Each structure stands twice: as structure tokens, then as C-alpha cells.
Amino acid sequence: MTNGIADALTGSNIRKSFGKFQLNIPELHIPEGFATALIGENGAGKTTLLNILAGIRNDYKGEVRYFAEKAQIVDAGIKERIGYTGSKNYFLSYWTGDQVRELAGLLFDGFDPVRFDNICKSLDIDSSIFGKTGKAVSKLSDGNLMKLVLATVFARNTDILLLDEPASPLDPLMRDMLSDMIRSYLAEGNGKRSVFFSTHNISDMESVTDYCILMEQGRIVEQGFVTDLKEKYILVKGDKENTEAARKLLLTCQANSFGFEGIALAEDMNRFAGMQVEFETPSLFQISVAIMRQNTVLTMPEIA
């Protein structure tokens, strides 16, 4: 359970190696009834983890439980309850819109073709891929192709969605609409539906994110409900005179000729006594970047 809340999906001792990279997750908990964001820099292991959870990869060690059951995703009834979108190669390039609709209906009992058509129309997906002379989906832009992927998965009757970078190819308006779609999906489930999505677009997706898992180098380095994380961390701002003294207390610090700002643990607020500083509630983006900076192997290059 997560903070006394039932889990939609759990994992234990999940391990997978690629050369020098190692995915190593002793425990994974995705709370039921919420939207959980998976955040981390490129190569952190987000896609690998999602592929394991979705049953795309089976060459891993450890155990995954779906809906409190010790079950494989291929077991009867489990696959039908899970919707998945990958970052690429979701459809064969020569498929038309009609073929996407037909094949989704053959693969999944809970696929609703009428709902699919309505979503496609609402999202203004290029209608030229439908009909007897429909074009191949490969003709769609990256944004429209992701819309089609989302229409397919949201047209199914599922209990959890596993979405790998669904916001990346989308424009700002469509990202906002995706957030609305996730909210509606959760609301229809009356607390029994869940969404687990990876994203680099933290600011755009923050409004729909209830719970957050931060990954770096194959490990979970922080997690929690967003409201709790915003109480755990604090944004500190101050004048340049206090920069060096404050830097010692900050997890990360950005300074210029006017002053500084950075993230600190809220429990350390009293250590800033005597400094001319202001405290603010940080955004999820600010918290995430601070934690990633703490754990990354990247270093700032010299820019001449």
C-alpha cells in the first residue's frame, strides 16, 4: 500500500541489465485511483520499466503484481484491464485508420469503435487516413500519430493506463487536453482506475499529476504524493550577499549578479536564520530538477 492507499500495481526486486546500465528497483508502488508521473533524465530507465510493466519485456528478474494479484500480464483478464502506449512503432506504418480500428477491436474485447471514432473527431485527427481510400498512418505528423495512439487506448475499457512519454510530440494545447482526458478517465473509474505515465514535460503535466516517482540511473531516488513533496522541499530566494552562505544549505543553487534561488529541505528552513531570504512553495518541475541534479552523472561543460 502507498500511504494507506491500495496499489493498482506493485513490483519487487525488479532488475534488468544492459551492458553497464542496471535497472534496480527493490520496491515499486503505483497507488490506485491516481495519476502517477514517472520522471527522470534520458537513460534513467523509464521506458525499460514501463515495457516490463506492460509485458513488452519479459527478460527481467523480479515480480510484478497487477491489481493485488500475483499474475502475469498474459493471464486471463489481466491484459484486457491494462492500456499501453509506447513511444514509437505502435502501429505498422502501412496501416490505415480503418485498419487501426478493426485490429484494435480484434485484439481487445473492451475496445469501443464508436468511442474511438468520437475521440478521433474530437481531437481533429486527419480524416484522410479513414475510408476506402484511407492513407497510411505513416503520413501523419508525430503529434497526430500520438493523438491516434491515445484515441485507441482511451477507447478501451481498462483499469490502468501505462503511457510512455504521451505528451512529448503534442503541442501545448493538446497536452492540456491530454491532462483533461486523464482526469476524465480517472473520474469514470470512481477511484478504481489509475494512470502511470512517463514525462519530460513536467510543467505541462503537473496539474494532472497526483503522485510522482523520480528515477536516476535505474533507481528510484524519490517518490511521493505531489502535495507531500511540496511540503518536504522549499524554494529559497535571496540577494547575492547571501549566496555563498545559502549555497551550503541548498540541494541546488542558481545564482546571478542579482541573487540566487534554490531548493532546500523544508526541515532546514531555520538554518537560514539571519539571511535575507524568501521561502516559496516549489513547483514539481523545480523539485524534480533539483533531485535530478543531485543524482546525475552529468556535469556542466565550459562554454567559452
What are these regions (language model features)?
Residues 54:
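Helix-to-loop junction immediately C-terminal to a conserved catalytic motif
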Residues 39-41:
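The feature captures the beta-strand-to-loop junction immediately N-terminal to the Walker
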Residues 161-165:
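Catalytic Walker B motif of ABC-type/P-loop ATPase nucleotide-binding domains
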Residues 1-27, 32-34:
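A short, flexible loop at the N-terminus of ABC-type nucleotide-binding domains that lies
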Residues 86-148:
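ABC-family P-loop ATPase nucleotide-binding domains
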Residues 251-304:
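C-terminal coupling/interaction segments
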Residues 62-78:
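Conserved ABC transporter NBD signature motif
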